[in-house]
Curated annotation (Swiss-Prot):
It is found in: Golgi apparatus membrane. It is a single-pass type II membrane protein. Its EC number is 2.8.2.8, 3.-.-.-, 2.8.2.-. Residues 41-597 are annotated as: Heparan sulfate N-deacetylase 2. Residues 598-883 are annotated as: Heparan sulfate N-sulfotransferase 2. Pfam families: HSNSD-CE, HSNSD_N, Sulfotransfer_1. GO terms for cellular component: Golgi apparatus; Golgi membrane; membrane. SUPFAM superfamilies: P-loop containing nucleoside triphosphate hydrolases. Residues 49-81 are annotated as: Disordered. This is Bifunctional heparan sulfate N-deacetylase/N-sulfotransferase 2. The gene is NDST2. Glycans are attached at N233, N350, N400, N666, N726, N802. Residues 65-78 have a biased composition (Pro residues).
Length: 883
């Protein structure tokens, strides 16, 4: 029996193992079948989200304000001619949340501002320049810092506000230690704090209302339990926003009904002390406070810092015909698109969806989706159309312009075959590739194939923060800032929206999307084909947004085609026509959409910036003798210097600029540089240079400005300048403002570059002092080896070149040259080291007096920077003191 069991047992174990394996195989098969079924079956759709409805109840819900509203008073305009349009913002710290929110709104509105830490005793910043006010408005992040100023500072600030008609905005943020009820120090105003409120309403009688549409109710509880309300019997205070206590809140002290509307934002009309104010009983986290804040800024500045009511919006739908099966539009989706467009046209004049197509992907969806493609083409004349790339390829991947143009021609041929209009003059590159950073081939192909006049991108100057996005013009094409709206190719279902559907609704109802339209006169929104299929979130979002804007604002919404829209943009912001090129390698997103055939290693590590006639050409020559240093190739059109940052060459882009430099054999040890002596006194070069070359070292050479002026005059005579030939040097430098323009132009080129401290301050605005080297021009002339030693140390160049052995003074030339074998030398050209008569005494005395204050300011600046004072400057200051 035991032997039989030994025989049977292995067989039974084998069958059990087989059974387990069969069960596992069956389970895996079932799971695979289920996964296939789920992935291939149409998703059970929940009901489509309905756009947010019309405005909430606009009538009063309960009693109105505790006292009758004061009749509206016109704002007291600031003394326009006596104040700068700059806002002074007192913040608690550089990182405080409310302070950052205040600054973000000012920046988005393009208002100039200056931030200061809320002052302690006696720390009030300077408010005036002689009789001119520096600020048009004062904002306190913490109202108590204003109220509790020491007597001297408070008197100083209040007197300034009264004299210059400057208003104050203040925020009271309650915390757990705040008194529940207290009188605001020095004011007939009581505060009741740490309250829970509900049912917000705008007071239609508030004088400051501009963008805000009054008499609207925001029902429901307000977020948080730290709200403050204001009470006063003084006629100077007018409620702006009002709310009710939540049912569970204890009653507010005084004769106030529980159902009464309690002011959370009040406007001080200035009847108490002559200063108009707007006081907030909370921060800016609640959206309605942002809206009122913008109106308060406009009112208190007499509309000097004020946003216009006109808003232009354009909704682009990218990737038409592109998209995987299951995400594309069907016939019903196209019908809904047409229906919503018609509804929006009743609210937004001329509203038209703008469709961007890639023809290669036409009819690549399911049968239903292909029918949707046909439906779009059937109604093609109801929409605006613009080209993407034929195959949705990123343009920066095409290094050959003709190949790029061929791709565009395929898309254009598709458009012509299907009757798609091609005359809009607008295009968008997939992923904004090639628009910024500039891919020259894209701009050229766009113009040759499509006649493009306008494009848009979210990448200039950077994607984030969005409020910094700007426009520019390049190669005749206007580039507009493009905005996101929270909808991307993967956001296609309402209940699967990242962070939950409430996040989308919050963006629409006073959040990021609402603020984008509120604070930008022109908004081009990027959406995608998939946002209009499935749950049609694109339709939901923009219909809801438009209705919400019309409920709460007086904005006049409208749509323009891209070319008139771009023209309008640059009418509003003409200062943005010129771009500001930046280093593509400093932004990962930029580097990802920049040609891999390009390298930032071709950008220079240092610049010799001038000024002219100080010895910069000699430094260029001496540095070129160093094996680790390579100069830019000479320019055939601008006297060998590139002159990129201060001439029309700048608009040719950084590709043009980098073509003047070789690819270094070793980017870490090789030093590329350029010398353009006209850079020093240019108003635009420091900003442009710092944007593209933020880590570059800057070298300038300073000589006696009187000698520099005389040298320039003689230089112009040698080049046959008729003004220099017909006027003496003294006549040039002493010319009055009534003299001929050509004479005054030569005078400026002689004198203005010598305002050394003024120009250096401009450079130091954009570059840290550690990146700036000031070379003594007199030392360079008499002992160039010492100057070159300082330059090598400043740049960190290795190996170290001994210029004492390298340079030799040439008696015939009268200056230093490269020493060669056999006692020979290699020198600069014949135009360098030119000899001319000494300056006459009258001119020398005139210039000594003329440059005295400039030289004194230069001495002070060098002292602050810890840089040595050049020998010529010491001599000039000594002579001035003796005189």
């Amino acid at each position: 029996m035991l032997q039989l069991w030994k025989v049977v047992r292995p067989a039974r174990q084998l069958e059990l193992h087989r059974l387990i394996l069969l069960l596992i195989a069956f389970s895996l098969g079932s799971m695979g079948f289920l996964a296939y079924y789920v992935s291939t079956s149409p998703k059970a759709k929940e009901p489509l989200p309905l756009p947010l409805g019309d405005c909430s109840s606009g009538g009063a819900a309960g009693p109105g304000p505790a006292r009758p509203p004061v009749p509206p008073r016109p704002p007291r305009p600031p003394e326009t001619a006596r104040t700068e349009p700059v806002v002074l913002v007192f913040v608690e710290s550089a990182y405080s949340q409310l302070g950052q929110e205040i600054v973000a709104i000012l920046e988005s509105s393009r208002f100039r501002y200056s931030t200061e830490l809320a002052p302690g005793r006696g720390d009030m910043p300077t408010l005036t320049d002689n009789t001119h006010g520096r600020y048009v408005l004062v904002i306190y992040e913490n109202l108590l810092k204003y109220v509790n100023l020491d007597a001297w500072s408070r008197e100083l600030l209040d007197r300034y506000c009264v004299e210059y008609g400057v208003g104050i905005i203040g925020f009271f943020r309650a915390h757990e230690h705040s008194l529940l009820s207290a009188q605001l120090k020095g004011f007939p105003l009581f505060l009741h704090s740490n309250l829970g409120l509900r049912d917000y309403q705008v007071n239609p009688s508030a004088p400051l209302l501009h963008l805000t549409r009054p008499s609207r109710l925001e029902p429901g509880p307000l977020p948080g339990d730290d709200w403050t309300i204001f009470q006063s019997n003084h006629s100077t205070y007018e409620p702006v926003l009002l709310a009710s206590l939540r049912p569970a809140e204890p009653a507010v002290p005084g004769p106030v009904l529980r159902r009464a509307r309690l002011p959370t934002v009040v406007q001080d009309l200035g009847l108490h002390d002559g200063i108009q104010r707007v006081l907030f009983g909370h921060g800016l986290s609640f959206w309605l406070h942002k809206l009122i804040f913008v109106d308060a800024v406009a009112y208190l500045t007499g509309k000097r810092l004020c946003l216009d009511l006109d808003r232009y919006i354009l909704v682009d739908i990218d990737d038409i015909f592109v998209g995987k099966e299951g995400t594309r539009m069907k016939v019903a989706d196209v019908e809904a698109l047409l229906t919503t467009q018609n509804k929006l046209r009743t609210l937004v004049p001329n509203f038209t969806f703008n469709l961007g197509f890639s023809g290669k992907f036409y009819h690549t969806g399911t049968e239903e989706e292909d029918a949707g493609d046909d439906m779009l083409l059937k109604h093609r004349k109801e929409f605006w159309w613009f080209p993407h790339m034929w195959s949705h390829m990123q343009p920066h991947l095409f290094h050959n312009r003709s190949v790029l143009a061929d791709q565009m021609r395929l898309n254009k041929q598709f458009a012509l075959e299907h009757g798609i209009p091609t005359d809009l003059g607008y295009a968008v590159a997939p992923h904004h590739s090639g628009v910024y950073p500039i891919h020259t081939q894209l701009y050229e192909a766009w113009k040759s194939v499509w006649g493009i006049q306008v494009t848009s991108t979210e990448e200039y100057p950077h994607l984030r923060p969005a409020r910094y996005r700007r426009g520019f013009i390049h190669n005749g094409i206007m580039v507009l800032p493009r905005q996101t709206c929270g909808l991307f190719t993967h956001t296609i279902f309402y209940n699967e929206y990242p962070g939950g559907s409430r996040e989308l609704d919050r963006s629409i109802r006073g959040g990021e999307l609402f603020l984008t339209v509120l604070l930008n006169p022109i908004s081009i929104f990027m959406t995608h084909l998939s946002n209009y299929g499935n749950d049609r979130l694109g339709l939901y979002t923009f219909e809801s947004l438009v209705r919400f804007l019309q409920c709460w604002t007086r904005l006049r919404l409208q749509t323009l085609p891209p070319v008139p829209l771009a023209q309008k943009y640059f009418e509003l912001f003409p200062q943005e026509r010129s771009p500001l090129w930046q280093n593509p390698c400093d932004d990962k997103r930029h580097k990802d959409i920049w040609s891999k055939e390009k390298t930032c290693d071709r950008l220079p590590k240092f610049l010799i910036v001038g000024p002219q006639k100080t010895g910069t050409t000699a430094i260029h020559f001496f540095l070129s003798l160093h094996p680790a240093v390579t100069s830019s190739f000479p320019s055939p059109s601008t006297f060998e210097e590139i002159q990129f940052f201060n001439s029309p060459n700048y608009h040719k882009g950084i590709d043009w600029y980098m073509d003047f430099f070789p690819v270094p054999s070793n980017a870490s040890t090789d030093f590329l540089f350029e010398k353009s002596a006209t850079y020093f006194d240019s108003e635009v070069v420091p900003r442009r240079g710092a944007a593209l070359l933020p880590r570059a070292k800057i070298i300038t050479v300073l000589t006696n400005p009187a000698d520099r002026a005389y040298s320039w005059y003689q230089h112009q005579r040698a080049h046959g300048d008729p003004v220099a030939l017909n006027y003496t040097f003294y006549q040039v430098i002493s010319a009055s403002s009534q003299t001929p323009l050509a004479l005054r132009s030569l005078q400026n080129r002689c004198l203005v570059p010598g305002y050394y401290s003024t120009h250096l301050q401009r450079w130091l605005t954009y570059y840290p002092s550690g990146q700036l080297l000031i070379v003594d021009g007199q030392e360079l002339r008499t002992n160039p080896a010492a100057s070159m030693e300082s330059i090598q140390k400043f740049l960190g160049i290795t190996p170290f070149l001994n210029y004492t052995r390298t340079l030799r003074f040439d008696d015939d030339k009268g200056f230093w040259c490269q020493g060669l074998e056999g006692g020979k030398t290699r020198c600069l050209g014949r135009s360098k080291g030119r000899r001319y008569p000494d300056m006459d005494t009258e001119s020398r005395l005139f210039l000594t007096d003329f440059f005295r204050n400039h030289n004194l300011e230069l001495s002070k600046l060098l002292s602050r920077l810890g840089q040595p004072v050049p020998s010529w400057l010491r001599e000039e200051l000594q002579h001035s003191s003796l005189g």
